[in-house]
């Protein structure tokens, strides 16, 4: 009340301009996907799914779309910041700490609920804490759920590359190495539990731990292409 009306309007105008600029800059890659101009229906379909899911989708949920994309079409999306990972397709720029904080604020403001949810401490790659139970919120923060564990999605991709590189002789078994534990930032017991949940069989040979891929049988999910009205970023221009 002590601020004069014209000064209040100037302040409101300044704050709105500042916020609009921050949103535009921080979420630039998301807006580029929303406004993508492509005649290719598969590029548009994947862009739509990424936009509707706030920059990250599980690869197996959009597998048909991904498999139909040529290398040139993937390059088009990569140039917009899309990362094609083993487990997820995501906009990697959206998982920087400052961008995660902004997206969470927008998400909470739009939902008007779950205001007591906060992301894990930035810098953590592995979380095993019962206070983190909201799977959708944690994926928004960049973490994938494995039972009671959460692992950062970009770290999952690095782990997958590490597994490939560790299997130089192309055998069906991979030796568990200390650098794999260091990458996730967890102990061996937790790593073994997570790797099993990822579809690997773990076994011991000569006092050493190995694992090999034994994928679970999955039921195919149909893709929902209906426009959602509860996307927290839909109102942003």
Labelled PLM ranges:
Residues 1-176, 183-188, 193, 201-202, ...:
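Acidic, serine/threonine- and proline-rich low-complexity intrinsically disordered segments
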Residues 209-213:
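Minor-groove-contacting beta-hairpin "wing" of winged helix-turn-helix DNA-binding domains
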Residues 223-237:
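Short linear clamp-binding motif
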Residues 216-222:
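Short, charged/polar, Gly/Pro-enriched secondary-structure boundary elements
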Residues 181-185, 223-226:
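Short, flexible active-site recognition loops that position polar ligands and cofactors
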Residues 203-208, 232-236:
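Short, surface-exposed, charge-dense and proline/glycine-enriched linear segments
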